[in-house]
Each structure stands twice: as C-alpha cells, then as structure tokens.
From Swiss-Prot:
Record's protein name: Cytochrome b
Alphabetically ordered keywords of this record: Electron transport, Heme, Iron, Membrane, Metal-binding, Mitochondrion, Mitochondrion inner membrane, Respiratory chain, Transmembrane, Transmembrane helix, Transport, Ubiquinone
Originating species: Geophagus steindachneri (Red hump earth eater)
The family this protein is said to belong to: Belongs to the cytochrome b family.
Gene3D superfamilies per the UniProt record, alphabetical: Cytochrome Bc1 Complex, Chain C
GO MF term list: metal ion binding; ubiquinol-cytochrome-c reductase activity
List of residues binding heme b b566: 59
Residues annotated as binding heme b b562: 45
SUPFAM superfamilies: Transmembrane di-heme cytochromes
Main location group: mitochondrion
Length: 96
C-alpha cells in the first residue's frame, strides 16, 4: 500500500516537475501553489517515503526477533531488496 501511494504521488508530481536547473525551484513552487492539492500530494510523497522505510525497518526487526536470519537465501534476497530500495530512494532524492 505504501509503495502504491508512492508511485501514484510520484507520477502526479512528475507531471508538473521540470528538472532544468533554471526552472526546478519554480516548478516545485508551481506544484505547491497552482496545482489543485499539489501541496498535499507533495507532502504525501515526502512523508510516505519516511513511513515506507519505517515499515521496512519494522519488517526487518520482526525477522530478527523471530530468527528469520537463519534462512540464509531468503535473508540475502531481503538484504538485496533493501539495498535496491535505498539506492532507488537516493537516486530519486539526490539526482533530480
């Protein structure tokens, strides 16, 4: 559910965002001021990513508590997925 909300809000934000260095800040201001509920979509996207990572960390904590790390292959796939999610978040946050 978190990932679906992130994808949808990200798509709506991408419809109005320009990555040009001269107009990027203006496009964010446009999203917040001129787009209907743009401020809400931007806040949902920002806070949704934090909530998504909290859910991931709780999931990891549950796995540690119940000893799921003993299943090496499953645990390694989870670690790889965690690293991919963190890399994707970094690329989406830093590079635009």
């Amino acid at each position: 559910l978190c990932x679906i909300x992130q994808i949808l809000t990200g798509l709506f934000l991408a419809m109005h965002y320009t990555s040009d260095i001269a107009t990027a800040f203006s496009s964010v201001a446009h999203i917040c001021r001129d787009v209907n509920y743009g401020w809400l979509i931007r806040n949902m996207h920002a806070n949704g990513s934090s909530f998504f990572f909290i859910c991931i960390y709780l999931h990891i904590g549950r796995g540690l508590y119940y000893g799921s790390y003993l299943y090496k292959e499953t645990w390694n796939v989870g670690v790889i997925l965690l690293l991919l999610v963190m890399m994707t978040a970094f690329v989406g946050y830093v590079l635009p």
